[in-house]
């Protein structure tokens, strides 16, 4: 069974603060990706999808599932990543979101030469 392992998640405030204090940024129409290299040897993901940006819980949950699954299938360098949602994301289709994510993962990987 495939899973998004606990080790691949940013869970604690210190983990999020580590990224926020000196993050690099990639901005798209739908997302803001904040990322910072870590010393763990694998990538970790944190999600910050607020009610203000995505009002309905089922939309937030759908988008979180898409983000986690896309992250899980992507081979990334050792970075901690926080994804912030932008307004209007809930109106996008799953295919549109996945297409945008794949382009962004490639851009992020190219920042670290992987």
From Swiss-Prot:
It is an enzyme of class 3 (hydrolase). This is Ribonuclease P protein component. RNaseP catalyzes the removal of the 5'-leader sequence from pre-tRNA to produce the mature 5'-terminus. It can also cleave other RNA substrates such as 4.5S RNA. The protein component plays an auxiliary but essential role in vivo by binding to the 5'-leader sequence and broadening the substrate specificity of the ribozyme. Its EC number is 3.1.26.5. GO terms for cellular component: ribonuclease P complex. NCBIfam families: rnpA. One of its GO terms (molecular function) is tRNA binding. It catalyses: Endonucleolytic cleavage of RNA, removing 5'-extranucleotides from tRNA precursor. Consists of a catalytic RNA component (M1 or rnpB) and a protein subunit. It comes from the Bacteria. One of its GO terms (biological process) is tRNA 5'-leader removal. InterPro entries: Ribosomal_Su5_D2-typ_SF, Ribsml_uS5_D2-typ_fold_subgr, RNase_P, RNase_P_CS. Belongs to the RnpA family. Keywords: Endonuclease, Hydrolase, Nuclease, RNA-binding, tRNA processing. The keyword Hydrolase applies. It holds the Pfam family Ribonuclease_P.
């Amino acid at each position: 069974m495939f899973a998004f392992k606990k080790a691949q998640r940013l869970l604690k405030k210190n983990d999020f603060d580590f990224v926020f204090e000196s993050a690099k940024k990639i901005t798209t129409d739908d997302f803001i990706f904040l990322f910072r290299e870590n010393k763990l040897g694998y990538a970790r993901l944190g999600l910050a999808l607020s009610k203000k940006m995505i009002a309905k819980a089922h939309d937030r949950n759908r988008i979180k599932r898409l983000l986690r699954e896309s992250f899980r299938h992507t081979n990334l360098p050792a970075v901690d990543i926080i994804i912030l949602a932008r307004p209007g994301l809930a109106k996008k289709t799953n295919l549109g979101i996945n297409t945008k994510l794949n382009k962004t993962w490639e851009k992020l990987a190219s920042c670290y030469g992987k």
